[in-house]
Regions:
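Short hydrophobic alpha-helical segments that form membrane-spanning helices or hydrophobic packing faces
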Residues: 107-113
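An N-terminal alpha-helical hairpin/helix-loop-helix interaction module that forms a charged
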Residues: 1-99, 117-207
Length: 207
């Protein structure tokens, strides 16, 4: 059985475009179309797809080592993450995924995100520059405690009535976001590029 590509993802895909956003949506669609449950060959495909989208080269020996040592548990964690409605990972689970993804918390977060973008946010240097401080070093942000803190913050915000109301208003104003979870909408607000100045100052036309 194959999982369907989520409607909100499929609707936003524009194969003729070449922007980074469109490429990432296409990657999401490829991963969403993989069989359920994932088998090890699919898990390896996933981590290669994720690192094909990143500037860092995936270490195949590290992937092989993680598979050889923890294949069954790795599949359990990946399949549970793929079907989760909220983050349910333990420290051991995240450590296992980190070992599978170049010993990188950033890589593990992106693997989780592409498996289940509605639940697991991306954690990388761009996010850390906003969430922590500008110019934060990799040694400071590429660790599990920072990812847990960021993920926990987003999910705490997602349960706040004021945030829920703001996200509902955004959904109403932007039909393209219909069906997106609160976590995804918060990411949109936090990391959407600023509007050009001419659009900020433009006044509505008189009737």
């Amino acid at each position: 059985m194959h999982s369907a590509v989520p409607a909100t993802i499929a609707a936003e895909m524009h194969p003729t475009e070449s922007t980074g956003s469109d490429r990432s949506l296409q990657l999401l669609a490829h991963i969403a179309a993989l069989p359920t449950p994932l088998e090890m060959v699919h898990a390896v495909v996933c981590v290669h797809i994720v690192y094909g989208w990143m500037p860092t080269i995936l270490d195949p020996l590290g992937v092989s080592k993680a598979v050889d040592e923890n294949a069954n548990r790795l599949l359990e964690v990946l399949n549970a993450a793929r079907s989760a409605k909220e983050p349910r990972l333990t420290d051991d689970d995240l450590g296992l995924l980190r070992g599978f993804a170049n010993n990188s918390t950033v890589g593990a977060s992106k693997l989780l995100h592409f498996l289940n973008p509605c639940v697991y946010p991306i954690w990388d240097s761009r996010v850390a520059n906003r969430y922590l401080w500008s110019g934060v070093s990799r040694e400071t942000f590429d660790n599990e405690s920072r990812l847990w803190a960021y993920m926990g913050t987003l999910w705490d915000w997602s349960r706040d009535p004021t945030v829920k109301a703001a996200c509902a208003a955004l959904n109403k104003a932007c039909p393209n976001t219909k069906g997106c979870t609160t976590v995804r909408l918060m990411e949109l607000v936090l990391f959407h590029p600023p509007l050009p100045q001419k659009l900020k100052t433009r006044r509505p036309a008189k009737p």
